[in-house]
Amino acid sequence: MKMRIILPVLLALALTAAALVSFALKADGAAGVIVDAEAWARATPPGATTGAVYVTIANRGGAADRLLSVKSPAAGSAMLHETIEESGVSKMRETDGGIAPGAALEMKPGGAHIMLIGLTGPLKEGDTISVTLDFEKAGDMTVDAKVAGIGADGPVD
């Protein structure tokens, strides 16, 4: 009699455990994107309408992910840009934001960056601005970027 009760209970527990492990593996593959370094921005001169934010994003999951959009209350719009050189001239262009599993997207001056367009006010040294990154699989992630001085090469210490 006890065996008739114990076997179905053990079977139910085993199936539940298997389902949880499967869910955990899927979650790891889909939401493995993390911010790997401190987000920072450069201060802007008076009257500037654009600014830049830099951060390193690592994909620690098992599937590729892509940064779909960026938004910030500090600007009317924001997008992921990269700096390229064509015929000896540096130009910026929008980029797709794809991050392969195990790879990282390192944003830094002269390279990839988040371009803030239509600033709502100047980016002042010492301030902090909020930036929301929307990933295809990992969803939304909000980071706070500390504003460094004009011409800074890295985050505020």
Residue ranges: model-predicted function:
Residues 1-5:
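Positively charged n-region of N-terminal signal peptides that target proteins for export
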Residues 10-22:
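Bacterial N-terminal signal peptides
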